[in-house]
Swiss-Prot record:
One Gene Ontology CC term in the entry: blood microparticle
Organism domain of life: Eukaryota
Keyword Signal attached: no
Signal sequence extent: none
Protein name per the record: Hemoglobin subunit beta
Annotated organism of origin: Coturnix japonica (Japanese quail)
Cross-referenced SUPFAM superfamilies: Globin-like (SSF46458)
Residues bound to heme b: 63, 92
PROSITE patterns: GLOBIN
Protein purpose: Involved in oxygen transport from the lung to the various peripheral tissues.
Keyword vocabulary terms for this entry: Heme, Iron, Metal-binding, Oxygen transport, Transport
UniProt miscellaneous comment: This beta chain is from both the minor and the major components, which have been called the Q-I the Q-II component, respectively.
Length: 146
């Protein structure tokens, strides 16, 4: 994947403003609420019975932070995303059996969360760069499935 200097700047510039705990928790909670079938991968998280329960669930918040922290590894390694996520791809494929389509869904949700948090900074150009990034990350995570 080739990244232009402008794309790199738009991605890293916005990433520097992201509250990983807050945005990660919101992104994962939105995934579980908007796409309820994804909840089956989080059965051990306890109460996911309603949007309020999901938003208040400490395990959802903690895992959301973990997910977005790992997404930060992509931002730091834009030129080596495939290798950055090879172990996570293996884990999600071989051990957790997560449907790779869920990576795309989470990427789309992350775009919505970023747009909601950074209305002025999230220009169409910024969105295009981030859309490319979430697509590349989803593809890297789905790699072991092919």
């Amino acid at each position: 994947v080739h990244w232009s200097a402008e794309e790199k700047q738009l991605i890293t510039g916005l990433w520097g403003k992201v509250n990983v705990a807050e945005c990660g928790a919101e992104a994962l909670a939105r995934l579980l609420i908007v796409y309820p079938w994804t909840q089956r991968f989080f059965a051990s998280f306890g109460n996911l019975s309603s949007p309020t329960a999901i938003l208040g669930n400490p395990m959802v918040r903690a895992h959301g932070k973990k997910v977005l922290t790992s997404f930060g590894d992509a931002v730091k390694n834009l030129d080596n995303i495939k290798n950055t996520f090879s172990q996570l791809s293996e884990l999600h494929c071989d051990k957790l059996h997560v449907d790779p389509e869920n990576f795309r869904l989470l990427g789309d949700i992350l775009i919505i969360v970023l747009a909601a948090h950074f209305t002025k900074d999230f220009t169409p150009e910024c969105q295009a760069a981030w859309q490319k990034l979430v697509r590349v990350v989803a593809h890297a995570l789905a790699r072991k499935y092919h």
